[in-house]
């Protein structure tokens, strides 16, 4: 028995020399014979090649995924900065209503929106009912879906607003379905004054803090309130200075989404810097502000003049409101310098004020926008200083008063068409004690309130 050293050479690009000891027999004087059994004489070159190709493919995929991860890191950094910048807004809301801030599941939120879309889509094909109302709800749900998509990576404040809007839409859908079953529909069409007046005011819907911050308590906000305006999607916010008197500028947003995200703002200055000195010739005074047909109407600073500023051309005008009292002579209870309060409704533009002759009683004036003058006035029996605010619907004045830090009451009305007045009691919840401004918009039938720096709105119902 002898030990033989065998050297096998495997012919392949990936092979090497292999040495192995084996038992053999001596054949002759210088030959050692060993028996070697190889299971397969051919090397699997094709399989190795395929493995190499697969390795290259996987390597490329790993590189692609790494690139995607880097891009995601950049996106996450961007949104992290946005969240940090929006933290202040959440903190303000936590101070106001901490019990309302809860974790919201976006998946649940989006699922509810999809259900609403399906529900309204089914209602759109029904032959009866009020198609205008259905289309309005359909468009609002579509807008809400878009807004939730934008808010998913942003602050909780707007998520809660979206949740509240969905709850509100669900309630309106129930009412809408009831209207569909009713023949004929009892819904009062938008723009119509064929009704019996104000019937109900919804709970408050919180939009957000004004763009200047929590220190700016007084101001006004809303949409273009002229009936059937071409600027229905435009929003404006007008916080007064911290003194609660001077309005130096307003901010305009092209859409609700822009307003909620504080995006794409357009600032309209009312105070002018002339020779390094602030000129308040066209500055505003008080929060009795409204936008009507793309024009801002307000009380000129330190005067009984009415001011008008075009939101597009920046042209400023002023006209005296004869005999009107000003400079906080007769403002609303709880808010300063709102001696002159502009309001818009289905009938046009109005101004609410007082005169020496009226002895502090509310006077309603109809504004002729063509001549920028007040053509007709009505003197009521209601003291302005006993009211917290007022608004117009279809030529009828509605006056509110405070019943405490959380409740407001619409308690007085005056019809300019008939000259008749009356008392009523329609409750209106509020989130803070002071109502700094309150205005009506006939295009969406909402009330817009500015209260302690926050923007709120209410849905209203009219008696058919």
From Swiss-Prot:
The keyword Secreted applies. Most, if not all, of the six potential sites for N-glycosylation carry carbohydrate moieties of 8-10 sugar residues. It is found in: Secreted, Extracellular space. Residues 192-464 form the Olfactomedin-like domain. Keywords: Disulfide bond, Glycoprotein, Olfaction, Secreted, Sensory transduction, Signal. Glycans are attached at residues 21, 85, 143, 228, 279, 383. InterPro entries: Olfac-like_dom (IPR003112), Olfactomedin-like_domain (IPR050605). Pfam families: OLF. Residues 1-16 form the signal peptide. Disulfide bonds join 193-394. Expressed exclusively in olfactory neuroepithelium. Oligomer; disulfide-linked. May influence the maintenance, growth, or differentiation of chemosensory cilia on the apical dendrites of olfactory neurons. Major component of the extracellular matrix of the olfactory neuroepithelium. This is Olfactomedin. It comes from Aquarana catesbeiana (American bullfrog).
């Amino acid at each position: 028995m002898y030990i033989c050293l065998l050297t096998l050479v495997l012919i392949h690009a990936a092979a090497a020399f292999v040495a192995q000891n084996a038992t053999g027999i001596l054949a002759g004087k210088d030959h050692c014979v060993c028996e070697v059994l190889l299971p397969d004489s051919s090397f699997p070159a094709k399989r190795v090649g395929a493995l190499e190709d697969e390795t290259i493919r996987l390597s490329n995929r790993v590189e692609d995924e790494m690139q995607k991860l880097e891009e995601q890191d950049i996106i996450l950094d961007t949104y992290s900065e946005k969240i940090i910048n929006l933290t202040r807004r959440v903190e303000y809301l936590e101070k106001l209503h901490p019990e309302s801030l809860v974790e919201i599941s976006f998946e649940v939120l989006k699922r509810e929106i999809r259900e609403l879309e399906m529900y309204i889509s089914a209602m759109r094909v029904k032959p009866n009912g009020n198609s205008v109302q259905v289309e309005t709800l359909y468009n609002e749900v579509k807008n809400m879906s878009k807004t939730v998509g934008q808010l998913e990576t942003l602050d909780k404040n707007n998520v809660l607003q979206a949740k509240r809007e969905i709850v509100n839409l669900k309630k309106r859908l129930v009412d809408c379905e009831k209207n569909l079953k009713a023949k004929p529909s009892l819904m009062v069409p938008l723009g119509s004054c064929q009704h019996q007046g104000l019937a109900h005011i919804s709970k408050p819907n919180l939009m957000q803090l004004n763009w200047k911050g929590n220190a700016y308590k007084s101001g006004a906000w809303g949409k273009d309130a002229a009936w059937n305006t071409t600027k229905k999607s435009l929003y404006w916010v007008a916080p007064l200075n911290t003194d609660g008197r001077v309005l130096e500028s307003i901010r305009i947003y092209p859409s609700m989404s822009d307003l909620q995200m504080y995006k794409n703002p357009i600032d309209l200055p009312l105070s002018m810097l002339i020779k390094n000195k602030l000129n308040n010739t066209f500055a505003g005074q008080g929060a009795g502000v409204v936008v009507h047909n793309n024009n801002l109407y307000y009380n000129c600073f330190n005067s009984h003049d009415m001011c008008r500023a075009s939101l597009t051309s920046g042209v400023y005008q002023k006209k005296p409101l004869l005999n009107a009292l000003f400079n906080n002579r007769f403002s609303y209870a709880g808010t300063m310098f709102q001696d002159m309060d502009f309001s818009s409704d289905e009938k046009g533009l109005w101004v609410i004020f007082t005169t020496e002759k009226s002895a502090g009683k509310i006077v309603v004036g109809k504004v002729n926008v063509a001549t920028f003058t007040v053509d007709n006035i009505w003197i009521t029996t209601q003291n302005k200083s006993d009211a917290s605010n007022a608004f117009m619907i279809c030529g009828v004045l509605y006056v509110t008063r405070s019943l405490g830090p959380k409740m407001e009451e619409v308690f007085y009305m005056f019809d300019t068409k008939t000259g008749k007045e009356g008392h009523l009691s329609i409750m209106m919840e509020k989130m803070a004690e002071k109502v700094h401004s309150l205005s009506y918009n006939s295009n969406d039938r909402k009330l817009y309130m500015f209260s302690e720096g926050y923007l709120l709105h209410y849905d209203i119902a009219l008696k058919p």
